[in-house]
């Protein structure tokens, strides 16, 4: 059996352009592609934080260091310049590989420069008190340190 696993996430990127008449895809700064280990042509899911739109397309490389996140083609009707998006890639893995796999998670600033990275898909944006972990209920007080989700999974796997 193959499992579909998160391989990369670029969190809270700012859309810099949208071109309805372009053939399709999402243009991503080549430096971000490399840091996230994404290839041109690789399938990605884009989640628009502003309006909830969710779409699938493929990545193409934009100029390195430009900060470009460009939504191309029909998706430009769903995502506008200035919107915050999460760009997600998934990969198929056999069970053993999936249990060892560590995703790449990038955090970017408003200019789409990398400000942090990690391997915990539930980690909130560093230094942003309005971002919450995705794996802790918000109505239950937590007064003990919570290990990252990735570390907890690896720890659980090591004891099996």
From Swiss-Prot:
It catalyses: L-aspartate + H(+) = beta-alanine + CO2. Keywords: Autocatalytic cleavage, Cytoplasm, Decarboxylase, Lyase, Pantothenate biosynthesis, Pyruvate, Schiff base, Zymogen. It is found in: Cytoplasm. Pathway: Cofactor biosynthesis; (R)-pantothenate biosynthesis; beta-alanine from L-aspartate: step 1/1. CDD domains: Asp_decarbox. GO terms for cellular component: cytosol. Belongs to the PanD family. NCBIfam families: panD. This is Aspartate 1-decarboxylase 2. It comes from Frankia casuarinae (strain DSM 45818 / CECT 9043 / HFP020203 / CcI3).
